[in-house]
UniProtKB/Swiss-Prot annotation:
One of its GO terms (cellular component) is cytosol. With EpmB is involved in the beta-lysylation step of the post-translational modification of translation elongation factor P (EF-P). Catalyzes the ATP-dependent activation of (R)-beta-lysine produced by EpmB, forming a lysyl-adenylate, from which the beta-lysyl moiety is then transferred to the epsilon-amino group of a conserved specific lysine residue in EF-P. Signal peptide: none annotated. Homodimer. Keywords: ATP-binding, Ligase, Nucleotide-binding. It comes from Pseudoalteromonas translucida (strain TAC 125). The keyword ATP-binding applies. It catalyses: D-beta-lysine + L-lysyl-[protein] + ATP = N(6)-((3R)-3,6-diaminohexanoyl)-L-lysyl-[protein] + AMP + diphosphate + H(+). It is an enzyme of class 6 (ligase). HAMAP family: EF_P_modif_A. The keyword ATP-binding applies. This is Elongation factor P--(R)-beta-lysine ligase.
């Protein structure tokens, strides 16, 4: 049977539902006096996260005859934090983000992200606000909350905060990942493998579930918790086999943030991965001063999938990567 590749991958009826959801999200924030902003999709720097790959290109123009390397952003986070440091107050953005990774039922290399930041909030206050939005858009019961440690122990019987590399390798072998475990010496890679493949499928099956207090080694751009230096003020939201959101009690210390970027790039160098330019504008903004705040990135396409009961991301976007 022939396929009309000129036609949208989503039905017009679904795209109309999507438009209503986007309008509802905007109204949610307008009612709370959260300002909508726009930031660049192209930047001279990008995320250093070792698990993310950015698209990059070269800009050839006045003053850049040999080409200026630019990256499509995996998230608007860095630029939005610069706005916060400049005194914007609470802000949100609906935008395209780009990740050079696989396409599948839950992934498209170009996708729509909702990101927002709340000065004066910690991760728990932000989780409560996200929960309100989930109830509005998905008409679901209030979310539940689990610590990363409890979720991991409940399914796999091992404390992820105290487990040694050898214990994680053994557990991964027992769970059917011997081909990876026998050569893996990075503790967090094993933690993420086990959590993704074995723990995540058990979370949020009946109602949305926040998993919080991720290991400090996976803090990314979150603060380390004052009460327990083994964990970070980071959380993720899961519902019906999908990771919907990733949020932080934001790191505001410029020195620590620069160290984390450098550590990522050192790991990249040692493991044959491309090093990524550190966002010096973000570091300068943190040096200027970023007030305590919490922020979150939420995948709009996956949210629409849940709201419209679709099983593939291409069913909720106008043109997936095969038709773009």
């Amino acid at each position: 049977m022939s396929v009309n590749l000129w036609a949208p991958s989503a039905s017009i009826a679904t795209l109309k539902q999507r438009a209503v959801i986007l309008r509802s999200i905007r109204e949610f924030f307008y009612a709370r006096n959260v300002m909508e902003v726009e930031t660049p999709s192209l930047s001279g720097a990008s995320v250093t996260d070792i698990h993310l790959v950015s698209f990059n290109t070269r800009f050839v123009g006045p003053g850049h005859a040999s080409g200026l390397e630019l990256y499509l952003q995996t998230s608007p986070e860095f630029a939005m934090k610069r706005l916060l440091a400049a005194g914007s107050g609470p802000i949100f953005q609906l935008c395209k983000a780009f990740r050079n990774e696989e396409a599948g039922s839950h992934h498209n290399p170009e996708f729509t992200m909702l990101e927002w930041y709340r000065p004066g909030f910690d991760e728990f206050a932000l989780m409560a606000e996200i929960d309100e939005l989930m109830q509005l858009i998905l008409d679901v019961a209030p979310s539940e909350r689990l610590t990363y440690q409890h979720a991991f122990e409940q399914v796999l019987g091992l404390d992820p905060l105290t487990a040694s590399l050898e214990q994680l390798q053994q557990l991964a072998c027992e769970q059917g990942f011997a081909d990876i475990a026998k050569n893996e010496t990075h503790r967090d890679t094993l933690l993420q493998l086990l959590f993704c493949m074995k723990v995540e499928p058990t979370i949020g099956q009946h109602k949305p579930c926040f998993v919080y207090h991720f290991p400090a080694s996976q803090a990314a751009l979150a603060q380390i918790c004052d009460h327990d230096s083994r964990v970070a003020g980071r959380f993720e939201l899961y519902y019906k086999n999908m990771e919907l959101a990733n949020g932080f009690n934001e790191l505001t210390n410029a020195t620590e943030q620069a160290k984390r970027f450098n550590d990522d790039n050192e790991y990249r160098k040692q493991n044959g991965l491309k090093q990524v330019p550190m966002d010096k504008h973000l570091i300068a903004a943190l040096e200027h001063g970023l007030a305590p705040c919490a922020g979150v990135a939420l995948g709009i396409d996956r949210l629409v999938m849940l709201a419209t009961q679709k099983s593939n991301i291409k069913e909720v976007i106008a043109f997936d990567v095969t038709r773009a």
